Regions:
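Polybasic/polar functional segments that serve as interface/processing modules
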Residues: 1-149
């Protein structure tokens, strides 16, 4: 079964200046941080209440079949986010780089768990991308959740 894909924007948002307002811009940031050639890794970044990003966290040497690692990353990054203030909550974008894979069984449940973990810390999980050799897709779609941009 083919999965819907997301394409990266040719526009690369500047750190701390340009808002990341859509999945294409967020995926462009993910592509910037990815290793070449592609290896199993996790990538994540927080967005301020104005959707501007800064630092990118890359976790390499992720065991290829440790699909739950993304939930641990979401939990840690959302705990590290500043508390929501008058300007609103922080957002979070994560990506699982699966060079030889795609969506796997349980990704919809992982999306729901990761979303709950981020909300416990006052952070909005905006997107989780799964990136493979054939493109990128979002487990959110499997869960039937709407886009959050």
């Amino acid at each position: 079964m083919s999965q819907p894909t997301v394409s990266a924007s040719p526009h690369l948002p500047r750190a701390y200046l340009d808002p990341i307002d859509n999945a294409s811009d967020a995926l462009a940031v993910v592509h910037l941080a990815m290793q070449t050639p592609m290896v199993p890794e996790l990538i994540g970044f927080l967005l301020d209440p104005h959707n501007r990003g800064g630092s990118i966290v890359v976790v390499g040497d992720v065991p290829e079949h440790d699909h739950d690692a993304v939930c641990r990353m979401v939990e840690l990054l959302s705990q590290a986010a500043p508390s929501p203030d008058d300007e609103g909550a922080y957002g979070l974008v994560v990506a699982s780089i699966r060079p030889d894979g795609w969506l796997v069984d349980g990704d919809a449940d992982r999306w729901r768990l990761a979303d709950g973990l981020s909300r416990l810390n006052g952070v909005d999980l905006l997107e989780w991308f799964v990136v493979g050799r054939h493109g990128a897709t979002c487990p959110r779609l499997l869960a039937g959740d709407p886009e959050r941009w």
